[in-house]
Design a protein with these regions (language model features):
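Class I S-adenosyl-L-methionine-dependent methyltransferase catalytic core
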Residues: 1-184
């Protein structure tokens, strides 16, 4: 795995592939960032953005955001091994001052410190609790006016976002479906 663009382009990312984590493939990540850069329907700026990387695993999405100029990325994950790799990556890439590691379940975090521009959610494909987490994030109003939600799901998933999200776009890459949305 590697950083695809920005100031750290080409740098290698350590990763961990277990049953509990499945890193976002480089090709899928590259397509997400191409859409962020070139889509007419998505108008969120990555430069100086506050990004919340939820179910972050080793944090490949958030690391990419930091390489491309994001101001701050909290990474939320509960898997100890994934967090160890993430911490190592942040130190090796010398971007740890722009990151916060939160070892907790999203539903246990009752108060967030900031409002965010970009939310990235990559929950386990079988986990449906993430929809309740989305509702809670929406209710806490921790999103800026200019925001975007990006969700990585299995391509055949049938998630119900009614009343929570306005879907802007969906793209399928192999087994993955990427959803671009806004809070309603």
């Amino acid at each position: 795995m590697r950083i695809i663009g920005g100031s750290l382009k080409g740098r290698i990312i350590q990763f961990l592939k277990t049953k509990n984590t499945r890193p976002l493939k480089d090709s899928v990540r590259e397509n997400i960032f191409n859409i962020l850069s070139h889509s007419n329907e998505i108008s969120v700026e990555l430069k100086n953005a506050f990004v919340l990387d939820l179910y972050s695993g080793i944090g490949s999405f958030g690391l990419e955001c930091l390489s491309r100029g994001a101001k701050m990325v909290p990474f939320v994950e509960i898997d100890f091994e994934a967090l160890k790799i993430l911490k190592d990556n942040l130190l090796i890439l010398s971007i740890h001052k722009h990151a916060e590691i939160i070892k907790n379940r999203i539903e246990n975090i009752k108060k967030w410190k900031k409002k965010y521009n970009i939310f990235f959610l990559d929950p386990p494909f079988k986990d449906l609790r993430f929809i309740d987490n989305l509702k809670e994030l929406k209710n806490q109003k921790i999103y800026k006016k200019d925001h975007l939600i990006i969700i990585h799901r299995e391509k055949n998933s049938k998630d119900d976002f009614e009343g929570i999200l306005k879907i802007l776009n969906e793209k399928v890459y192999g087994r993955s479906k990427i959803i671009f949305a806004l809070f309603k």
